[in-house]
Amino acid sequence: MARGKFITFEGIDGAGKTTHLGWFRDRLEQKVAPAGRSVVMTREPGGTKLGESLRDILLHEAMDLETEALLMFAARREHLAQVIEPALARGDWVLSDRFTDATFAYQGGGRGLPRDKLEALERWVQGGFQPDLTVLFDVPPDTASERRSAARAPDRFESESDAFFARTRAEYLRRAEEAPYRFAIIDSTRSIADIQKQLEDLIASL
C-alpha cells in the first residue's frame, strides 16, 4: 500500500481549529476507508504516553524559554517515532492538532526565540519531514481572545496577551507565505458552514 498522508491543523488559541477537527476526521475517513486506510487523529504536544506527560508540564509549569522549545521537540521526536511515521508507513493518514509550525509561531514568534535555533532542532528531529497539508485557521487576536474567554479555564499559553498572539499569528502567516504549496489558509471569522465547505473542497483535492 502507498504511504499515507500527513495533515496538520494550526492556528492561535481561539482560532477555532479544534471545532472542526472531529468533523474533518470523519469526512477524511469516508474518503480513505474504501481503499482500506484509516485516519489517525493525534495532537501536539502529546500523542504518546511520554508526549502527554510533557504536555501537562508544558501547559501548566513555568520554565525557561529554551527548555520549553527543547521539550516541544522532544515530545515531537517521540510522536514521530511512535505514532506518525508508523501510521504513514502502513498507508494510514494522520491528522494532527498542531505540529512544528506551532513551535515556530509560539516559541519563535510569540516568545522571541531565534529562528535559527528552532531550525536546527527541526533539522535534527525531522530531517526534511514536513506535512503534506497544513490547514491554518486564521483569526485576529481580539476575536480569538473573546472566544478563549468564553471557554474553559485557560492554560499557560491561552493566558498570554493579545500582543503575544499578534506575534504568533504573524509568524504563522510568514510560514504560510514561505510554503504556499502545503498551506491552506482558512478565514476563521466566517460561519461554521462556510468553513466546512472550504474544508470539503480541500479533502476533495487530496
UniProtKB/Swiss-Prot annotation:
It catalyses: dTMP + ATP = dTDP + ADP. ATP binds at G11, I12, D13, G14, A15, G16, K17, T18. Belongs to the thymidylate kinase family. Phosphorylation of dTMP to form dTDP in both de novo and salvage pathways of dTTP synthesis. The gene is tmk. This is Thymidylate kinase. Its EC number is 2.7.4.9. GO terms for biological process: dTDP biosynthetic process; dTTP biosynthetic process; dUDP biosynthetic process. It comes from Paraburkholderia phymatum (strain DSM 17167 / CIP 108236 / LMG 21445 / STM815) (Burkholderia phymatum). Pfam families: Thymidylate_kin. Keywords: ATP-binding, Kinase, Nucleotide biosynthesis, Nucleotide-binding, Transferase. Signal peptide: none annotated. GO terms for molecular function: ATP binding; dTMP kinase activity. It comes from the Bacteria. It is an enzyme of class 2 (transferase). GO terms for cellular component: cytosol. InterPro entries: P-loop_NTPase (IPR027417), Thymidylate_kin-like_dom (IPR039430), Thymidylate_kinase (IPR018094).
